[in-house]
Amino acid sequence: MSQLKLEEISSVIEEKIKNFELDCDMAEVGKVVSYADGVAKIYGLNGVMSYEVLEFETGDKGVAANLEEDSVGVIVFGFGNNIKEGTSVKRTKSLMKVPVGDAVVGRVLNALGEPIDGKGEIETNEFSLIEQKAPGIMDRKSVHEPLQTGIKAIDALVPIGRGQRELIIGDKQTGKTTVAIDTIINQKGQNVICIYVAIGQKESTVAQVVRKLEEYGAMEYSVVVNASASDSAAMQYLAPYAGVAMGEYFRDHARHALIIYDDLSKHAVAYREISLILRRPPGREAFPGDVFYIHSRLLERAAKVCDEKGAGSLTALPIVETQAGDVSAYIPTNIISITDGQIFLETDLFYSGIRPAINVGLSVSRVGGAAQIKATKQVSGTLRLDLAQYRELQAFTQFASDLDEASKKQLERGQRMVEVLKQAPYSPLPIEKQVVIIYAGAKGFLDSVSVKKVVDFEERLYPFLEAKYPQVLEEIHIKKALDKDLEAMLKKALEEFKLTYSE
Protein backbone atom coordinates (compact mmCIF):
# COMPACT_ATOMS: atom_id res chain seq x y z
CA MET A 1 0.00 0.00 0.00
CA SER A 2 1.55 3.27 -1.17
CA GLN A 3 1.81 5.97 1.44
CA LEU A 4 0.85 9.59 0.61
CA LYS A 5 3.75 11.94 0.97
CA LEU A 6 3.30 15.00 3.19
CA GLU A 7 4.25 17.34 0.31
CA GLU A 8 1.53 15.85 -1.91
CA ILE A 9 -1.11 16.34 0.78
CA SER A 10 -0.07 19.96 1.34
CA SER A 11 -0.05 20.69 -2.42
CA VAL A 12 -3.58 19.22 -2.79
CA ILE A 13 -4.81 21.34 0.14
CA GLU A 14 -3.12 24.43 -1.32
CA GLU A 15 -4.76 23.79 -4.71
CA LYS A 16 -8.17 23.41 -3.06
CA ILE A 17 -7.71 26.65 -1.08
CA LYS A 18 -6.61 28.48 -4.26
CA ASN A 19 -9.71 27.34 -6.19
CA PHE A 20 -12.11 28.03 -3.34
CA GLU A 21 -14.50 30.88 -4.15
CA LEU A 22 -16.01 32.76 -1.25
CA ASP A 23 -19.45 33.28 -2.76
CA CYS A 24 -21.20 35.09 0.03
CA ASP A 25 -24.58 36.65 -0.74
CA MET A 26 -25.29 39.42 1.74
CA ALA A 27 -28.96 40.15 2.28
CA GLU A 28 -30.72 42.25 4.87
CA VAL A 29 -33.50 40.05 6.21
CA GLY A 30 -36.44 40.77 8.49
CA LYS A 31 -39.34 38.78 9.92
CA VAL A 32 -43.10 39.27 9.62
CA VAL A 33 -44.54 40.25 13.01
CA SER A 34 -48.16 40.46 11.83
CA TYR A 35 -50.06 40.25 8.55
CA ALA A 36 -53.65 41.30 7.86
CA ASP A 37 -55.66 42.69 4.92
CA GLY A 38 -52.72 43.00 2.52
CA VAL A 39 -50.44 44.83 4.96
CA ALA A 40 -47.49 43.18 6.75
CA LYS A 41 -45.64 44.55 9.77
CA ILE A 42 -41.96 43.62 9.59
CA TYR A 43 -39.22 43.74 12.22
CA GLY A 44 -35.51 43.86 11.43
CA LEU A 45 -35.19 45.87 8.21
CA ASN A 46 -33.52 48.99 9.56
CA GLY A 47 -31.92 50.30 6.35
CA VAL A 48 -34.99 50.02 4.11
CA MET A 49 -35.93 52.93 1.79
CA SER A 50 -39.41 54.41 1.48
CA TYR A 51 -41.34 52.53 -1.25
CA GLU A 52 -38.52 49.99 -1.71
CA VAL A 53 -39.58 46.63 -3.14
CA LEU A 54 -39.29 43.77 -0.62
CA GLU A 55 -39.37 40.01 -1.31
CA PHE A 56 -41.07 37.48 0.96
CA GLU A 57 -39.80 33.89 1.15
CA THR A 58 -43.27 32.83 -0.09
CA GLY A 59 -42.54 34.53 -3.44
CA ASP A 60 -44.82 37.50 -2.72
CA LYS A 61 -43.59 41.07 -3.15
CA GLY A 62 -44.50 44.35 -1.51
CA VAL A 63 -43.40 47.94 -0.97
CA ALA A 64 -42.31 49.58 2.27
CA ALA A 65 -44.95 52.23 2.96
CA ASN A 66 -44.59 52.98 6.68
CA LEU A 67 -41.11 53.43 8.14
CA GLU A 68 -41.35 53.37 11.93
CA GLU A 69 -38.67 53.26 14.65
CA ASP A 70 -38.86 49.54 15.31
CA SER A 71 -40.87 48.16 12.37
CA VAL A 72 -41.77 48.61 8.70
CA GLY A 73 -45.32 48.60 7.30
CA VAL A 74 -45.36 46.80 3.93
CA ILE A 75 -48.14 46.90 1.34
CA VAL A 76 -48.25 43.42 -0.27
CA PHE A 77 -48.99 43.35 -4.02
CA GLY A 78 -51.16 40.26 -4.20
CA PHE A 79 -53.32 38.76 -1.49
CA GLY A 80 -50.33 37.08 0.22
CA ASN A 81 -52.30 34.02 1.29
CA ASN A 82 -49.13 32.14 2.36
CA ILE A 83 -47.64 34.96 4.45
CA LYS A 84 -47.77 34.35 8.18
CA GLU A 85 -46.04 35.40 11.36
CA GLY A 86 -42.33 34.54 11.18
CA THR A 87 -42.10 34.59 7.35
CA SER A 88 -38.73 36.05 6.36
CA VAL A 89 -38.50 39.13 4.13
CA LYS A 90 -35.45 40.48 2.33
CA ARG A 91 -34.55 43.81 0.76
CA THR A 92 -34.09 44.17 -3.00
CA LYS A 93 -32.49 47.64 -2.67
CA SER A 94 -34.51 48.84 -5.66
CA LEU A 95 -37.61 50.99 -5.96
CA MET A 96 -40.64 49.85 -7.93
CA LYS A 97 -40.24 49.96 -11.73
CA VAL A 98 -42.49 49.14 -14.68
CA PRO A 99 -41.66 48.44 -18.34
CA VAL A 100 -42.01 51.47 -20.62
CA GLY A 101 -41.60 52.36 -24.29
CA ASP A 102 -43.17 51.08 -27.50
CA ALA A 103 -43.04 47.48 -26.23
CA VAL A 104 -46.03 48.13 -23.92
CA VAL A 105 -48.22 49.71 -26.63
CA GLY A 106 -51.14 47.50 -27.63
CA ARG A 107 -50.96 45.50 -24.40
CA VAL A 108 -53.12 45.00 -21.31
CA LEU A 109 -51.03 45.08 -18.12
CA ASN A 110 -51.56 44.90 -14.38
CA ALA A 111 -50.34 47.53 -11.88
CA LEU A 112 -46.88 45.89 -11.76
CA GLY A 113 -46.47 46.17 -15.53
CA GLU A 114 -46.97 42.42 -16.05
CA PRO A 115 -48.99 41.37 -19.13
CA ILE A 116 -52.47 39.95 -18.46
CA ASP A 117 -53.65 39.68 -22.09
CA GLY A 118 -52.13 36.26 -22.86
CA LYS A 119 -49.92 37.68 -25.65
CA GLY A 120 -46.61 36.65 -24.08
CA GLU A 121 -43.92 38.53 -22.19
CA ILE A 122 -43.03 42.17 -22.81
CA GLU A 123 -39.61 42.25 -24.43
CA THR A 124 -37.93 45.48 -23.38
CA ASN A 125 -34.84 46.68 -21.54
CA GLU A 126 -36.45 50.00 -20.67
CA PHE A 127 -37.94 50.37 -17.21
CA SER A 128 -39.02 53.44 -15.31
CA LEU A 129 -39.61 54.21 -11.63
CA ILE A 130 -43.31 54.61 -10.86
CA GLU A 131 -42.58 57.56 -8.54
CA GLN A 132 -40.92 60.40 -10.46
CA LYS A 133 -40.58 64.11 -9.80
CA ALA A 134 -42.96 66.22 -11.89
CA PRO A 135 -41.39 68.72 -14.35
CA GLY A 136 -40.54 72.09 -12.75
CA ILE A 137 -41.85 75.49 -13.86
CA MET A 138 -38.87 76.18 -16.15
CA ASP A 139 -39.21 72.78 -17.83
CA ARG A 140 -42.81 73.50 -18.85
CA LYS A 141 -44.43 75.49 -21.62
CA SER A 142 -47.94 76.93 -21.63
CA VAL A 143 -50.59 74.75 -23.27
CA HIS A 144 -51.07 75.85 -26.89
CA GLU A 145 -51.73 72.79 -29.09
CA PRO A 146 -55.26 71.35 -29.26
CA LEU A 147 -56.06 67.80 -28.21
CA GLN A 148 -59.33 67.18 -30.02
CA THR A 149 -61.79 64.80 -28.42
CA GLY A 150 -64.06 64.55 -31.47
CA ILE A 151 -66.99 65.53 -29.22
CA LYS A 152 -68.64 68.74 -30.45
CA ALA A 153 -69.74 70.00 -27.02
CA ILE A 154 -66.21 69.60 -25.62
CA ASP A 155 -64.13 70.86 -28.57
CA ALA A 156 -66.38 73.93 -28.97
CA LEU A 157 -67.11 74.85 -25.34
CA VAL A 158 -64.51 73.23 -23.05
CA PRO A 159 -61.50 72.74 -25.35
CA ILE A 160 -58.60 70.61 -24.14
CA GLY A 161 -54.96 71.31 -24.98
CA ARG A 162 -51.97 68.97 -25.00
CA GLY A 163 -50.45 68.91 -21.52
CA GLN A 164 -53.68 69.91 -19.78
CA ARG A 165 -55.40 68.11 -16.88
CA GLU A 166 -59.16 68.12 -17.48
CA LEU A 167 -61.43 66.40 -14.97
CA ILE A 168 -64.45 64.39 -16.15
CA ILE A 169 -66.91 64.42 -13.26
CA GLY A 170 -70.42 63.09 -12.80
CA ASP A 171 -72.64 60.48 -11.18
CA LYS A 172 -72.40 56.83 -12.17
CA GLN A 173 -73.97 55.88 -15.51
CA THR A 174 -73.71 59.38 -17.02
CA GLY A 175 -71.25 58.49 -19.81
CA LYS A 176 -67.90 59.47 -18.25
CA THR A 177 -65.99 56.45 -19.61
CA THR A 178 -67.68 56.90 -23.02
CA VAL A 179 -66.28 60.47 -23.26
CA ALA A 180 -62.80 59.09 -22.44
CA ILE A 181 -63.05 56.22 -24.96
CA ASP A 182 -64.30 58.61 -27.68
CA THR A 183 -61.26 60.79 -27.03
CA ILE A 184 -58.94 57.77 -27.43
CA ILE A 185 -60.67 56.72 -30.68
CA ASN A 186 -60.31 60.29 -32.00
CA GLN A 187 -56.50 60.21 -31.53
CA LYS A 188 -56.15 57.80 -34.47
CA GLY A 189 -53.54 59.18 -36.85
CA GLN A 190 -52.64 62.03 -34.46
CA ASN A 191 -49.44 60.35 -33.14
CA VAL A 192 -50.76 60.34 -29.57
CA ILE A 193 -50.16 57.27 -27.39
CA CYS A 194 -53.17 56.66 -25.12
CA ILE A 195 -53.03 55.00 -21.70
CA TYR A 196 -56.26 53.87 -20.05
CA VAL A 197 -55.90 53.10 -16.33
CA ALA A 198 -58.83 51.14 -14.89
CA ILE A 199 -59.00 51.36 -11.09
CA GLY A 200 -61.45 49.18 -9.19
CA GLN A 201 -63.60 48.49 -12.26
CA LYS A 202 -65.37 45.22 -12.93
CA GLU A 203 -63.32 42.82 -15.10
CA SER A 204 -66.26 42.64 -17.55
CA THR A 205 -66.30 46.46 -17.91
CA VAL A 206 -62.56 46.57 -18.66
CA ALA A 207 -62.92 43.69 -21.16
CA GLN A 208 -65.68 45.69 -22.88
CA VAL A 209 -63.42 48.78 -23.08
CA VAL A 210 -60.58 46.70 -24.58
CA ARG A 211 -63.03 45.18 -27.09
CA LYS A 212 -64.26 48.65 -28.11
CA LEU A 213 -60.69 49.91 -28.56
CA GLU A 214 -59.85 46.86 -30.70
CA GLU A 215 -63.04 47.27 -32.73
CA TYR A 216 -62.12 50.87 -33.67
CA GLY A 217 -58.43 50.08 -34.25
CA ALA A 218 -57.40 52.18 -31.25
CA MET A 219 -55.55 49.41 -29.41
CA GLU A 220 -52.65 49.87 -31.89
CA TYR A 221 -51.66 53.08 -30.09
CA SER A 222 -53.09 52.35 -26.61
CA VAL A 223 -52.04 50.71 -23.35
CA VAL A 224 -54.53 49.43 -20.77
CA VAL A 225 -53.40 49.22 -17.14
CA ASN A 226 -55.93 47.28 -15.09
CA ALA A 227 -56.29 46.94 -11.33
CA SER A 228 -59.82 45.58 -11.12
CA ALA A 229 -62.23 45.37 -8.19
CA SER A 230 -61.02 41.79 -7.57
CA ASP A 231 -57.40 42.99 -7.13
CA SER A 232 -55.98 44.02 -3.77
CA ALA A 233 -56.15 47.64 -2.55
CA ALA A 234 -52.36 47.88 -3.06
CA MET A 235 -52.69 47.10 -6.78
CA GLN A 236 -55.52 49.64 -7.14
CA TYR A 237 -53.41 52.26 -5.38
CA LEU A 238 -50.30 51.62 -7.54
CA ALA A 239 -52.05 51.38 -10.94
CA PRO A 240 -52.22 55.13 -11.77
CA TYR A 241 -48.54 55.62 -10.90
CA ALA A 242 -47.59 52.70 -13.17
CA GLY A 243 -49.70 54.21 -15.97
CA VAL A 244 -48.24 57.70 -15.64
CA ALA A 245 -44.67 56.29 -15.68
CA MET A 246 -45.47 54.74 -19.09
CA GLY A 247 -46.92 58.06 -20.30
CA GLU A 248 -43.92 60.05 -19.06
CA TYR A 249 -41.61 57.98 -21.24
CA PHE A 250 -43.34 59.35 -24.36
CA ARG A 251 -43.55 62.88 -22.92
CA ASP A 252 -39.79 62.88 -22.26
CA HIS A 253 -38.98 61.46 -25.70
CA ALA A 254 -40.56 64.43 -27.54
CA ARG A 255 -43.82 62.57 -28.20
CA HIS A 256 -47.42 63.10 -27.12
CA ALA A 257 -49.43 60.92 -24.76
CA LEU A 258 -52.90 60.95 -23.21
CA ILE A 259 -53.70 59.22 -19.91
CA ILE A 260 -57.13 58.46 -18.50
CA TYR A 261 -57.61 57.51 -14.83
CA ASP A 262 -60.93 55.68 -14.46
CA ASP A 263 -61.56 56.57 -11.70
CA LEU A 264 -59.75 58.46 -8.93
CA SER A 265 -62.65 58.10 -6.44
CA LYS A 266 -61.92 54.36 -6.25
CA HIS A 267 -58.19 55.15 -6.07
CA ALA A 268 -58.79 57.34 -3.00
CA VAL A 269 -60.91 54.59 -1.41
CA ALA A 270 -58.11 52.04 -1.97
CA TYR A 271 -55.60 54.44 -0.40
CA ARG A 272 -57.94 55.06 2.54
CA GLU A 273 -58.16 51.30 3.10
CA ILE A 274 -54.36 50.91 3.08
CA SER A 275 -53.85 53.93 5.35
CA LEU A 276 -56.36 52.75 7.94
CA ILE A 277 -54.74 49.29 8.06
CA LEU A 278 -51.34 51.01 8.47
CA ARG A 279 -52.96 52.84 11.42
CA ARG A 280 -52.44 56.31 9.98
CA PRO A 281 -54.74 58.90 11.61
CA PRO A 282 -57.96 59.42 9.59
CA GLY A 283 -59.29 62.88 8.70
CA ARG A 284 -62.35 64.11 6.81
CA GLU A 285 -64.57 61.26 5.50
CA ALA A 286 -61.98 58.91 7.14
CA PHE A 287 -59.45 59.74 4.39
CA PRO A 288 -55.84 60.23 5.57
CA GLY A 289 -54.39 63.74 5.66
CA ASP A 290 -52.22 63.23 2.56
CA VAL A 291 -55.00 62.11 0.18
CA PHE A 292 -54.70 65.50 -1.59
CA TYR A 293 -50.97 64.92 -2.07
CA ILE A 294 -51.35 61.45 -3.62
CA HIS A 295 -53.53 62.99 -6.36
CA SER A 296 -51.60 66.24 -6.80
CA ARG A 297 -48.26 64.46 -7.26
CA LEU A 298 -49.93 62.14 -9.78
CA LEU A 299 -51.65 64.85 -11.84
CA GLU A 300 -48.70 67.29 -11.74
CA ARG A 301 -46.77 64.77 -13.85
CA ALA A 302 -49.01 65.65 -16.81
CA ALA A 303 -47.38 68.59 -18.57
CA LYS A 304 -46.49 70.30 -21.82
CA VAL A 305 -42.69 70.23 -21.84
CA CYS A 306 -40.60 73.17 -23.11
CA ASP A 307 -38.83 73.09 -26.50
CA GLU A 308 -35.39 72.58 -24.92
CA LYS A 309 -36.64 69.33 -23.39
CA GLY A 310 -38.20 68.08 -26.64
CA ALA A 311 -41.66 69.76 -26.56
CA GLY A 312 -43.45 66.49 -25.70
CA SER A 313 -46.68 66.40 -23.72
CA LEU A 314 -48.72 64.25 -21.38
CA THR A 315 -52.42 65.12 -21.12
CA ALA A 316 -54.45 63.73 -18.21
CA LEU A 317 -58.20 63.10 -18.11
CA PRO A 318 -58.95 61.98 -14.56
CA ILE A 319 -62.48 60.71 -13.91
CA VAL A 320 -64.28 61.23 -10.60
CA GLU A 321 -67.63 59.74 -9.62
CA THR A 322 -69.97 61.90 -7.56
CA GLN A 323 -72.81 60.79 -5.29
CA ALA A 324 -76.16 62.37 -6.26
CA GLY A 325 -74.39 65.20 -8.12
CA ASP A 326 -72.53 66.41 -5.02
CA VAL A 327 -69.42 68.13 -6.41
CA SER A 328 -68.64 69.65 -3.00
CA ALA A 329 -67.59 66.31 -1.46
CA TYR A 330 -63.98 65.88 -0.33
CA ILE A 331 -62.35 64.03 -3.25
CA PRO A 332 -64.22 65.92 -6.05
CA THR A 333 -63.26 69.34 -4.60
CA ASN A 334 -59.64 68.20 -4.15
CA ILE A 335 -59.32 67.11 -7.77
CA ILE A 336 -61.23 70.13 -9.13
CA SER A 337 -58.63 72.34 -7.39
CA ILE A 338 -55.71 70.34 -8.84
CA THR A 339 -56.95 70.16 -12.46
CA ASP A 340 -57.16 72.85 -15.18
CA GLY A 341 -60.92 72.58 -15.57
CA GLN A 342 -63.74 70.06 -15.49
CA ILE A 343 -66.38 68.51 -17.74
CA PHE A 344 -69.49 68.06 -15.62
CA LEU A 345 -71.90 65.32 -16.71
CA GLU A 346 -75.43 65.43 -15.32
CA THR A 347 -77.92 62.61 -14.74
CA ASP A 348 -80.97 64.78 -15.59
CA LEU A 349 -79.50 65.74 -18.98
CA PHE A 350 -78.55 62.12 -19.66
CA TYR A 351 -82.08 60.85 -19.03
CA SER A 352 -83.66 63.69 -21.00
CA GLY A 353 -81.78 62.42 -24.07
CA ILE A 354 -79.03 65.05 -24.19
CA ARG A 355 -75.95 62.89 -24.72
CA PRO A 356 -73.09 63.51 -24.05
CA ALA A 357 -74.81 64.89 -20.91
CA ILE A 358 -72.45 67.86 -20.49
CA ASN A 359 -73.66 70.67 -18.26
CA VAL A 360 -72.26 73.62 -20.20
CA GLY A 361 -72.77 76.05 -17.31
CA LEU A 362 -70.70 74.09 -14.78
CA SER A 363 -68.06 72.81 -17.23
CA VAL A 364 -64.98 74.93 -17.77
CA SER A 365 -61.54 74.71 -19.35
CA ARG A 366 -59.06 77.03 -17.66
CA VAL A 367 -56.19 76.78 -20.16
CA GLY A 368 -57.65 75.02 -23.21
CA GLY A 369 -58.94 78.22 -24.85
CA ALA A 370 -55.39 79.04 -25.95
CA ALA A 371 -55.21 75.67 -27.70
CA GLN A 372 -58.48 75.98 -29.63
CA ILE A 373 -58.11 76.39 -33.40
CA LYS A 374 -59.23 79.76 -34.83
CA ALA A 375 -62.05 78.26 -36.91
CA THR A 376 -63.72 76.77 -33.82
CA LYS A 377 -63.29 80.07 -31.92
CA GLN A 378 -64.93 81.92 -34.81
CA VAL A 379 -68.03 79.71 -34.95
CA SER A 380 -68.48 78.99 -31.24
CA GLY A 381 -67.50 82.36 -29.76
CA THR A 382 -70.98 83.20 -28.44
CA LEU A 383 -72.25 79.60 -28.18
CA ARG A 384 -71.86 79.29 -24.40
CA LEU A 385 -73.72 82.58 -23.83
CA ASP A 386 -76.44 81.67 -26.35
CA LEU A 387 -77.03 78.33 -24.62
CA ALA A 388 -77.15 80.00 -21.20
CA GLN A 389 -79.75 82.51 -22.46
CA TYR A 390 -81.72 79.65 -24.05
CA ARG A 391 -81.80 77.75 -20.72
CA GLU A 392 -83.01 80.94 -18.97
CA LEU A 393 -85.74 81.47 -21.56
CA GLN A 394 -86.74 77.82 -21.37
CA ALA A 395 -87.20 78.12 -17.59
CA PHE A 396 -89.20 81.34 -18.11
CA THR A 397 -91.57 79.75 -20.66
CA GLN A 398 -92.72 77.24 -18.05
CA PHE A 399 -94.48 80.15 -16.29
CA ALA A 400 -95.23 82.58 -19.13
CA SER A 401 -96.74 81.57 -22.46
CA ASP A 402 -96.63 84.88 -24.37
CA LEU A 403 -93.17 85.66 -25.72
CA ASP A 404 -92.05 88.39 -28.10
CA GLU A 405 -90.73 87.43 -31.54
CA ALA A 406 -87.05 87.89 -30.65
CA SER A 407 -87.37 85.60 -27.63
CA LYS A 408 -89.27 82.98 -29.66
CA LYS A 409 -86.54 83.07 -32.31
CA GLN A 410 -83.85 82.68 -29.63
CA LEU A 411 -85.73 79.76 -28.10
CA GLU A 412 -86.13 78.05 -31.48
CA ARG A 413 -82.44 78.45 -32.33
CA GLY A 414 -81.41 77.29 -28.85
CA GLN A 415 -83.40 74.07 -29.29
CA ARG A 416 -81.60 73.39 -32.56
CA MET A 417 -78.16 74.14 -31.10
CA VAL A 418 -78.84 71.63 -28.29
CA GLU A 419 -79.65 69.07 -31.02
CA VAL A 420 -76.46 69.98 -32.92
CA LEU A 421 -74.35 69.26 -29.81
CA LYS A 422 -75.89 65.79 -29.36
CA GLN A 423 -73.68 62.93 -30.49
CA ALA A 424 -73.88 59.15 -30.56
CA PRO A 425 -71.27 57.25 -28.51
CA TYR A 426 -68.09 55.99 -30.24
CA SER A 427 -68.55 58.36 -33.20
CA PRO A 428 -66.03 61.19 -32.76
CA LEU A 429 -66.22 63.90 -35.42
CA PRO A 430 -63.23 65.54 -37.19
CA ILE A 431 -62.84 69.21 -36.26
CA GLU A 432 -63.62 70.49 -39.78
CA LYS A 433 -67.04 68.80 -39.72
CA GLN A 434 -67.69 70.21 -36.24
CA VAL A 435 -66.95 73.72 -37.54
CA VAL A 436 -69.40 73.25 -40.44
CA ILE A 437 -72.38 72.06 -38.37
CA ILE A 438 -71.88 74.62 -35.56
CA TYR A 439 -71.59 77.37 -38.20
CA ALA A 440 -74.81 76.12 -39.83
CA GLY A 441 -76.64 76.25 -36.48
CA ALA A 442 -75.23 79.60 -35.34
CA LYS A 443 -75.92 81.36 -38.67
CA GLY A 444 -79.55 80.22 -38.88
CA PHE A 445 -79.31 77.55 -41.59
CA LEU A 446 -81.19 75.16 -39.31
CA ASP A 447 -83.97 77.60 -38.32
CA SER A 448 -86.38 76.20 -40.92
CA VAL A 449 -85.47 72.56 -40.15
CA SER A 450 -87.72 70.91 -37.56
CA VAL A 451 -85.98 70.09 -34.24
CA LYS A 452 -86.47 66.33 -34.72
CA LYS A 453 -84.75 66.48 -38.13
CA VAL A 454 -81.58 68.33 -37.09
CA VAL A 455 -79.63 65.07 -36.60
CA ASP A 456 -80.83 63.82 -40.00
CA PHE A 457 -79.82 67.15 -41.60
CA GLU A 458 -76.33 66.78 -40.13
CA GLU A 459 -75.96 63.15 -41.25
CA ARG A 460 -76.86 64.02 -44.84
CA LEU A 461 -74.82 67.24 -44.93
CA TYR A 462 -71.37 65.60 -44.60
CA PRO A 463 -71.69 63.21 -47.60
CA PHE A 464 -73.02 66.16 -49.67
CA LEU A 465 -69.97 68.30 -48.78
CA GLU A 466 -67.56 65.41 -49.40
CA ALA A 467 -69.06 64.83 -52.84
CA LYS A 468 -69.67 68.41 -54.07
CA TYR A 469 -67.53 70.72 -51.92
CA PRO A 470 -64.59 68.63 -50.65
CA GLN A 471 -62.36 71.74 -50.76
CA VAL A 472 -64.39 73.34 -47.93
CA LEU A 473 -63.52 70.56 -45.46
CA GLU A 474 -59.94 70.36 -46.78
CA GLU A 475 -59.32 74.10 -46.39
CA ILE A 476 -60.75 74.23 -42.85
CA HIS A 477 -58.46 71.29 -42.00
CA ILE A 478 -55.38 72.99 -43.48
CA LYS A 479 -55.99 76.68 -42.66
CA LYS A 480 -57.64 76.03 -39.26
CA ALA A 481 -59.47 79.35 -39.74
CA LEU A 482 -62.42 80.75 -41.71
CA ASP A 483 -61.33 83.59 -44.01
CA LYS A 484 -63.81 85.58 -46.16
CA ASP A 485 -63.45 83.37 -49.25
CA LEU A 486 -63.78 80.13 -47.28
CA GLU A 487 -66.80 81.46 -45.37
CA ALA A 488 -68.46 82.52 -48.64
CA MET A 489 -67.85 79.04 -50.10
CA LEU A 490 -69.25 77.40 -46.95
CA LYS A 491 -72.35 79.63 -47.09
CA LYS A 492 -72.87 78.75 -50.74
CA ALA A 493 -72.52 75.02 -49.99
CA LEU A 494 -75.01 75.21 -47.10
CA GLU A 495 -77.53 77.18 -49.18
CA GLU A 496 -77.26 74.66 -52.02
CA PHE A 497 -77.70 71.74 -49.61
CA LYS A 498 -80.76 73.39 -48.03
CA LEU A 499 -82.43 73.56 -51.46
CA THR A 500 -81.85 69.85 -52.07
CA TYR A 501 -82.71 68.82 -48.47
CA SER A 502 -86.26 67.66 -47.92
CA GLU A 503 -87.47 66.42 -44.56
Curated annotation (Swiss-Prot):
Catalyzed reactions: ATP + H2O + 4 H(+)(in) = ADP + phosphate + 5 H(+)(out)
Positions with a binding annotation for ATP: G170, D171, K172, Q173, T174, G175, K176, T177
GO cellular component: plasma membrane; proton-transporting ATP synthase complex
One Pfam family cited in the UniProt record for this chain: ATP-synt_ab_N
GO molecular function: ADP binding; ATP binding; proton-transporting ATP synthase activity, rotational mechanism
Any coiled-coil regions, as ranges: none
Membrane association type: Peripheral membrane protein
InterPro entries on file: ATP_synth_asu-like_sf (IPR023366), ATP_synth_asu_C (IPR000793), ATP_synth_asu_C_sf (IPR038376), ATP_synth_F1_a_nt-bd_dom (IPR033732), ATP_synth_F1_asu (IPR005294), ATPase_a/bsu_AS (IPR020003), ATPase_F1/V1/A1_a/bsu_N (IPR004100), ATPase_F1/V1/A1_a/bsu_N_sf (IPR036121)
Enzyme class: translocase
Main location: membrane
Top-level taxon of origin: Bacteria
Keyword Transport among UniProt keywords: yes
Subcellular location as annotated: Cell inner membrane
Record-annotated site: Required for activity: S363
Keyword check for Mitochondrion: no
UniProt xrefs under Gene3D superfamilies: 2.40.30.20, ATP synthase alpha/beta chain, C-terminal domain, P-loop containing nucleotide triphosphate hydrolases
Keywords, comma-separated and alphabetical: ATP synthesis, ATP-binding, Cell inner membrane, Cell membrane, CF(1), Hydrogen ion transport, Ion transport, Membrane, Nucleotide-binding, Translocase, Transport
EC annotation from Swiss-Prot or TrEMBL: 7.1.2.2
Annotated family: Belongs to the ATPase alpha/beta chains family.
Physiological role: Produces ATP from ADP in the presence of a proton gradient across the membrane. The alpha chain is a regulatory subunit.
Subunit structure: F-type ATPases have 2 components, CF(1) - the catalytic core - and CF(0) - the membrane proton channel. CF(1) has five subunits: alpha(3), beta(3), gamma(1), delta(1), epsilon(1). CF(0) has three main subunits: a(1), b(2) and c(9-12). The alpha and beta chains form an alternating ring which encloses part of the gamma chain. CF(1) is attached to CF(0) by a central stalk formed by the gamma and epsilon chains, while a peripheral stalk is formed by the delta and b chains.
NCBIfam families the UniProt entry points to: atpA (TIGR00962), PRK13343.1 (NF009884)
Protein name: ATP synthase subunit alpha
Taxonomic lineage: Bacteria, Pseudomonadati, Campylobacterota, Epsilonproteobacteria, Campylobacterales
Gene it is expressed from: atpA
